[in-house]
């Protein structure tokens, strides 16, 4: 499992892609803009392809990689506090392995921020420094770090709040995992290559209890990465301020990200990456799994007008967990769900997605694009309403590709674990839609 950034292109927001490998959602709902630390930006799920042969075997091919990204649009050199995760939040990756729109496995991540109280002798006094580092950093739990981030991982089987809970551990049995500090700059962490070497030290081999024999191993990493979602947010949200002919030409798919120079790709996110044996994720003979990520906050928050010394000590949080962010398929809450229901969608569960069906079957985006690109709501919008094709892509999966045998309509990212992985060099960035175009088909 490697975590080098590879751009994943949203080549054209006009296409609803049925690709079970990508998603995106940056600051998409009113409430989540007030809590960026729990704003889920992307969810990826795919068969691991590290070291696989051209026939899809070998290497890490028996594993599934799940990546949940949070905290969008992190500016480089965003100090002095940078982008630590929220210790008062619960970050989760959920798996439905029977097709009933309910989680049957959940991986829970909780974070702890340890202030080391680094101080310097200034005259006769020892005075705390104002930075999160006191010198160069190159190792796990480096002595020069004034703030150490760590996290725990638990696996829950069954309902996320009522199921059986077990600790995911390092291979030595320890339950605490370390997170690399965000990239501060070259003097603290060296150049890009040096930072990558430092970050790679925070990829840990893990043991997952309750998995079938020989399938209980995996890897985990949490840390800052360059945003891999390629889209020019400015032109897109400025009423798609680009020529329609350019946007609709599949030959321009690589230009959308400007070779990694699109505005969003000049920012960072915080990645939660987990690699698990596919045999641990599936149930019975069903090979299709559905995945999504959520973040939750405590129901009650008490602000302290006179906080004690410490780190993030201005609030006390308590009560039940309340889900405030949800992400599965690409761009659903960003471009499909109507503005009045965006917060509702973020708080909802897949099993209740019937309440949002009209947004999928009668989408407004094609009409908006017609207005902005051709001065007519009907100029570009398909007339095959209701859009059962979109319901298939987003809510049930595509037959023969990623549809479970007994599919309850729900918005989750689906992956058929029986389909072999493809080496990176021969992958199609547009997934199923890209393959249709490659063989001469047409997009609906």
Segment roles from a protein language model:
Residues 2-22:
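Gram-negative bacterial Sec-dependent N-terminal signal peptides
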Residues 22-444:
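Surface-exposed extracytoplasmic segments
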């Amino acid at each position: 499992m490697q975590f080098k950034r590879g751009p994943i292109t949203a080549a054209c927001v006009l296409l609803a892609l049925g690709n079970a490998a990508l998603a995106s959602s940056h600051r998409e709902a009113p409430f989540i803009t007030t809590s960026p630390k729990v704003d889920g930006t992307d969810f990826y799920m795919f068969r691991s392809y590290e070291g696989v042969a051209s026939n899809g075997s070998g290497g890490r091919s028996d594993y599934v990689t799940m990546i949940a990204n949070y905290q969008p649009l992190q500016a480089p050199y965003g100090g002095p506090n940078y982008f630590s995760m929220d210790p008062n939040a619960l970050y989760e990756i959920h798996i439905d392995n029977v097709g009933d729109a309910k989680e049957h496995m959940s991986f829970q991540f909780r974070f702890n921020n340890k202030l080391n109280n680094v101080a310097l002798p200034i005259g006769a006094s020892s005075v705390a420094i104002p930075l999160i580092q006191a010198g160069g950093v190159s190792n796990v739990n480096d002595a020069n770090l004034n703030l150490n981030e760590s996290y725990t991982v638990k696996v829950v089987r069954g309902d996320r709040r009522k199921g059986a809970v077990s600790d995911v551990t390092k291979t030595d049995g320890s339950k605490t995992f370390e997170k690399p500090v965000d990239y501060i700059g070259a003097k603290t962490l060296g150049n890009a290559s040096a930072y990558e070497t430092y970050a790679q030290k925070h990829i840990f081999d893990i043991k997952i209890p309750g998995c079938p024999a020989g399938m209980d191993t995996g890897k985990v990493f949490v840390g800052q990465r360059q945003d891999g979602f390629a889209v020019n947010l400015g032109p897109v949200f400025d009423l798609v301020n680009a020529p329609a002919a350019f946007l609709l030409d599949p030959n321009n798919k690589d230009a959308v990200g400007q070779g990694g120079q699109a505005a969003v790709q000049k920012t960072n996110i915080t990645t939660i990456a987990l690699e698990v044996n596919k045999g641990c994720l599936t149930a019975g003979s069903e090979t299709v799994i559905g995945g999504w990520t959520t973040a939750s906050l405590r129901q009650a928050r008490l602000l302290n007008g006179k906080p004690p010394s410490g780190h993030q000590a201005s609030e006390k949080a308590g009560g039940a967990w309340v889900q405030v962010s949800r992400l599965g398929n690409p761009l659903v809450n960003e471009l499909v769900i109507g503005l009045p229901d965006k917060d509702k969608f973020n708080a909802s569960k897949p099993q209740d997605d019937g309440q949002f069906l009209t947004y999928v079957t009668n989408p407004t985006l094609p009409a908006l694009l017609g207005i902005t690109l051709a001065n007519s709501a009907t100029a570009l919008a398909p007339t095959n309403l209701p859009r059962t094709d979109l319901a298939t892509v987003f809510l049930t999966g595509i037959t023969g590709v990623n549809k479970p045998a007994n599919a309850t309509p729900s918005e989750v990212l689906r992956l058929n674990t029986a389909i072999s992985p493809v080496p990176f060099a021969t992958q199609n960035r547009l997934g199923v839609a890209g393959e249709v175009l490659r063989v001469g088909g047409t997009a609906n």
